[in-house]
């Protein structure tokens, strides 16, 4: 117990000290606070994008899902997340250009600059904030899991403590501090996750022995195949979900705006798929192997499988050290989410005449409390919370892509697209049985299938409304992708 306190306490203190050091050249203006002066080069952009995207969902959600589903979850996450580099590249360069053109730091600000529509800006910002709250709740939920595994106390204590810590250093240093702590926490998380995998595999007698044990049991043999888990439609839907949802994460969009150049975005997109495999392989293998030791965990309880396995094989000292990987992953995402979502509220939703410093700080604190409350009182699993947020994000993609690439998009088309797409997402969440007879019921593993009808509705709303208001003015949907340096 005492050694665990030393490890976690030392890590928390180190992050606060590092954040204070990292703010040494922080300016007071929004561009410095939210975009680090648009100075992120290729290597730093890659590290901060990866550390921000690989969150509690990566460590605990994917290990819990692989416990229930098996190794078929590995290509779903590793290939799917890596594949999103395509959309990051196609959209990222145009986002950066429009961001500079309009002085925009968020997607709704860019849409406002392109369409001149305050209604479109407010609609998009409101939905993005609402979508981020469930995803924000993943991080304190996972912090509670780590705290419980280390100290045996209730989950909510760990959730509260980590939320306080992250809010403290986010308010201290803005994006520059967040990016610099991302680099440290990303390296810590990746290194310790691989150490944890080596410990679990060694305890199981080697990877071949573990896989043989899984395949030889009637209760676990299904963990090595995709039968009953991922049909072709579910697999394709999940790939589409990652492709369109991830660039819409406010914290990832913010980093594309903060890139130093188009070449930096190209280098990041080129290397990102390799980093995705390195990040997802350890937790998914640990979750699958964990079924041998703990065969009867329920859906929410399976999110605990990674810390449980690590503590079993590593003991208090080494196990506690490896569990810091989970803390590093969730903290490197939570700080970015708070900062990016705070910029949505202060720059898109609040009155520009409000006192800037008070608004920035109070909004970040309020968002952290909302996420904390949802994490403590909701009984949804980490995977459930993540899929809900992803589905809401994906609907934004057509409007953002169209607004970035065309100068004459009507703001009413953006509003229609968002409302139509989100209506389908809401239907999938609250009335999945409505999809019976004409589509796949979006429940459990089939939740991602809702992305196809929701994107279709969003595209239809965008195109039909745009056609009605703008085609008489000679608008054309001609879409061009210009060549750019990748390396």
Give a label for each model feature.
Residues 1-487:
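Membrane-embedded helix-loop-helix hairpins and adjacent transmembrane boundary segments
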